[in-house]
Amino acid sequence: MAAKIKKGDLVQVITGAKAERGGDRGKQGKVLRVFTDTNRVLVEGINRVTKHTRVGQSQRGTKTGGIEVVEAPIHISNVALVDPSTKKPTRVGFRLDTVEKNGVKKTVRIRVSKSSGKDI
């Protein structure tokens, strides 16, 4: 099955606590990575967690470790793709289209916004 959300897409968090209560619901961000085996996506600026790493030394002799804030993956069902034309979250459908390349006809799936009906 073709992926409904891909790397580089703009998505919006649709579940969880509201932003005014410290959550991420309603926030938008760009997809940095898609984990297909666990059905999770890494979204820029969303689901930020504090990670404590042990202090050590790198090969150059500099100190490593400390407290850093990184993004954690979020389940793909908790985000919705943002329609580029309306800037609102939408469901994604597919449309089959035949493309002729070098004399060979090939059927490709094109992602379509369910709300506006336009190609994504």
From Swiss-Prot:
Keywords of the record, alphabetical order, are:
Ribonucleoprotein, Ribosomal protein, RNA-binding, rRNA-binding
- The gene that this protein is the product of is rplX
Complexes and interactors:
Part of the 50S ribosomal subunit.
Matching entries from Pfam families are given as:
ribosomal_L24
A GO BP term here is: translation
Origin organism is: Pseudarthrobacter chlorophenolicus (strain ATCC 700700 / DSM 12829 / CIP 107037 / JCM 12360 / KCTC 9906 / NCIMB 13794 / A6)
Family to which the UniProt record says this protein belongs: Belongs to the universal ribosomal protein uL24 family.
Q: What does this protein do?
A: One of two assembly initiator proteins, it binds directly to the 5'-end of the 23S rRNA, where it nucleates assembly of the 50S subunit.
- Any one GO cellular component localisation term in the record: ribonucleoprotein complex
Record-linked InterPro entries? Rib_uL2_dom2 (IPR014722), Ribosomal_uL24 (IPR003256), Ribosomal_uL24_KOW (IPR041988), Translation_prot_SH3-like_sf (IPR008991)
What protein name does the entry list?
A: Large ribosomal subunit protein uL24
Listed GO MF terms:
rRNA binding; structural constituent of ribosome
